[in-house]
Amino acid sequence: MLALGLVSCLSLGTTLSAQRTKATTAKRTPIQTITPKRPAGQRDVLGLRLAPMPVVRVGFIGLGMRGPSAVERFVHLEGVEIKALCDLHPDRVEKAAKILTKAGLPEAATYSGEETAWKALCDRPDIDLVYIATDWARHTEMMIYAMNKGKHVACEVPAATTLKEAWDVINTAERTQRHCMLLENCVYDFFELTTLNMAQHGLFGEVLSAKGGYVHNLEPFWKYYDANWRLEANIGFRGDIYATHGLGPACWVLNIHRGDRMDYLISMDVPATTLPRFMERQMGVKNPQVKNGEMTHTLIKTAKGKTIYLEHNVTSYRPYSRL
């Protein structure tokens, strides 16, 4: 169960205290989320193991910002065949295809030009793994469709944007028994893996609390996201909307899903300031309404009483940090 709420401040005036408490209690009732029962016949996939594949045949969907670099990495992997490339924009597909040519690899099938072109890629019988690097809004639909077609899935974060989507992804993975991997790259970075290794060898004793975050001024990058989808996400949604860079490594160190689980959280933010000014100055938007706070702080409590502290800030002029 997760609960989301704000900590009430102690009232200084005893006369007004009862009135304020009554008013704020109604506004700050924790959001309760219930874990649904697993449908009959489903098995969890936390320990899913399948027979080894001598060759993994891969199809890529989304070749804008992150997709091409994934293709570049995969051309160096033994036991991998890149079978198909897909993006809404044909020029991006052509550019990614040149990566294969430069590496001396066979041409891949290409799909582009239509909103549903990616489905044809997932329908192919010669693909084992679908790699998704599109905008956030499309992740869930693509993951579920691919798994229902018998494919394993690797998807850039986030895997879902609503609780319903999250459970739909989980239920599909469990029902189809397909690997469904969240491509949270920071858990594999040098510092994070070194720290995890030290923790697992007992150098820190018992780890009781972990801290992480995503502090990254995205102002130089907004223009590169197709149709401003990432900027729109930060305008329209409140809270830590990009938590996994800091949360993923913390979960590994605290053995989340390996003996412990996250129980509830408290989250609060400060008013948005830098992004509205940017929108006025650079985009000519008058009186922009931005829901995402300048800084969001989140404190998570686990079932065993441990804590995780997260920060999210993508607009302030400060150095990049995940600590």
Question: How should each PLM-predicted stretch be described?
Answer:
Residues 22-103, 250:
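N-terminal Rossmann-like dinucleotide-binding module
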Residues 287-293, 300-323:
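NAD(P)-dinucleotide binding in Rossmann-like oxidoreductases
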